[in-house]
Each structure stands twice: as C-alpha cells, then as structure tokens.
UniProtKB/Swiss-Prot annotation:
This is NAD kinase. It comes from Burkholderia mallei (strain ATCC 23344). Its main location: cytoplasm. The gene is nadK. It is found in: Cytoplasm. One of its GO terms (biological process) is NAD metabolic process. Coiled coil: none annotated. Disulfide bonds: none annotated.
Length: 300
C-alpha cells in the first residue's frame, strides 16, 4: 500500500447538466464529511444541483483552499477542471459517471468505499502533461489556451481540405493537405488521435504526437516528437479552418494564421487507487483480450 499526503479540504465537482448527478454527489459529500473532511463544492456544480449548505467556491478559490478535487462525471468534466486547476497544482480524483472514462477511472458504484481511503492517504500519484497554444495573426498573438488532451486544427464539414505548413523548433517539417492535424499529449493519445490511427502513448512517456486527419498523401503518418518541441502550424490554404482545444473551446482561423503549440509549464496531478493499472484501463476501455485463452490478472 502506498501512503501519501492526507487531505483536509475536499472539493466536489460534477457535470452539472447530467441527469441524476445530484444524488450521488450529495451521497459522496455526506460520506466524506462523516469521516471528518471539510467538503466544498465547485460553484457551478453547487448552483445547478444545490450544495446542501456546503461552501461554494470558484476554481481559483478551490485551488487556493482545497487539497484535492474529486470530479464526478465523464472525461470531459475532468479535462475542463484539470485545465482550470493546473496553475494551483491541485490533485484530481476522477469518478466515472459518463461513458468511456479513460481518465475518470473509479466506478461510481465504488466511490463511497474507495474515495475516503484515498483522502486518508492511500493512493498512487502521477503527473499528466498539458499543452499550451497561442494563435498568432499578423505577428500578434490573439488567443491563448491550455489543452489537456489535444489541440486540433481542422476544416469545417462542408469546405475543402486544409493546407498546413508545419515546423518544429523553427525547422520546416512538411506541407500537408488534409482534413486537419491533431497535436496530442500522451493523455490525449487515446482520444481523437486514436480514432485517426495515431499511436497510444503511455501517460508517463515524455512525448507529443502529431496525427494527420485524413491526409491527401498516405505517406503523411503520425509522428511522436520530444515533449520539449515547439510546433508551429501555419494556415496556407483552405476555407473555414478552425482550431479547438480539448473540443471545449473553438476559434476560427484566417489564411496565414499560425498556431504555436508547446508543452505547458503546468502539469495535472492525478490520484489513483492503490493497485491502479493503466494497462487494465486499456484492456477494459478498448475491449482488448475479449476472448482470452487464459485469464490474466487485472494488474498485469
């Protein structure tokens, strides 16, 4: 068993527009408070579902006051909160109340048993990489954002191919005609990048993966770069091209705009139950080993 820091103040975050989220959040809050932890709610969550008298805090206030944030929802909820809390180095515990749940790895049915043990110090910790990106237009930055999974440059549904000029560390790599380009972290390698035939990167691998989306030339293949690479993507052709960050914020692009992407100085601490296995997560979520010749241990 790995014993880490024991927490005092615990922030609860839920996907507030999800039907049926109020009851499990209230149940978890009562369970945690009964064991002597101070419970606070993220403000939007509290407003949407009611916080039963618990303090309601903004993400910045959570970062300053809470020792850990427990997120009940899907991966999208975890991504959004991870970006907001990254500057404060607040650890996240993810409880899956969505569908796939690559990064919300605790089943909701187990949360009342597992979460109190983790808050008491029984957990495994890992750091996840973030990307930071900015859009440069006519030599001036016009937009800045963080991305936990990926930065995606792509065309709209009814326009032709995008034409992109890609450079790494100031060196020209290629011009590409495609539906777009994904720049993904190891965490994001199992998201949109995976569906575009990109490789899976272990979360502790120090790399950034570039994955073309439906490239015109089949020789345009995914490539894994060192995680200290500075990537520049210039729009040199095409109409209705945009960029999104974790599929949660979007910006329209113009001809000659450049998207500059690099590893962020921030990381996001994830806390997992003792015995957590990334490979078990892959087996379960990707349906590997569906018909095994022999059963393997979950922690293999």
């Amino acid at each position: 068993m790995k014993i880490g820091h024991q927490f005092h103040t615990v922030a609860l975050v839920g996907r507030s527009n999800t039907p049926g989220i109020a009851e499990p959040l209230a149940s978890l809050a009562a369970c945690i408070a009964k064991r002597g932890f101070e419970v606070v709610f993220e403000a939007d969550t509290a407003q949407a579902i009611g916080s039963a008298g618990y303090p309601a805090l903004t993400p910045a206030e959570i970062g300053a006051r809470a020792g850990v944030a427990v997120v009940l929802g899907g991966d999208g909820t975890m991504l959004g909160m991870g970006r907001q809390l990254a500057p404060y180095k607040t650890p996240l515990i993810g409880i899956n109340h969505g569908r796939l749940g690559f990064i919300t790895d605790i089943p909701a049915s187990d949360m009342r048993e597992v979460v109190p043990m983790m808050l008491a110090g029984s957990y495994e910790r890992e750091e996840r990489t973030l990307l930071e990106a900015r859009i440069v237009r006519n030599g001036e930055p016009i937009y800045h954002a963080l991305a936990f999974n990926d930065v995606v440059v792509n065309r709209s549904g009814f326009s032709g191919m995008a034409e992109l000029r890609v450079s790494v560390d100031g060196r020209f790599m290629y011009n590409q005609r495609s539906d777009g380009l994904i720049v993904a972290t190891p965490t994001g390698s199992t998201a949109y990048a995976l569906s575009s035939q990109g490789p899976i990167l272990h979360p502790q691998l120090q790399g950034i993966v570039l994955v073309p989306i439906a490239p015109h030339a089949l020789s345009n293949r995914p490539i894994v770069l060192p995680d200290d690479s500075k990537i520049a993507i210039q729009i040199i052709g095409g109409r209705d091209v945009n960029v999104n960050f974790d599929m949660q914020s979007f910006t329209a692009l113009e001809l000659n705009d450049t998207i500059e992407v690099r590893r962020s100085k921030h990381t996001v601490p994830f806390l997992h139950p003792v015995g957590y296995s990334y490979y078990a997560t892959l087996r379960k979520k990707l349906h590997w080993n569906e018909h095994p010749s022999s059963e393997e241990d979950d922690d293999a």
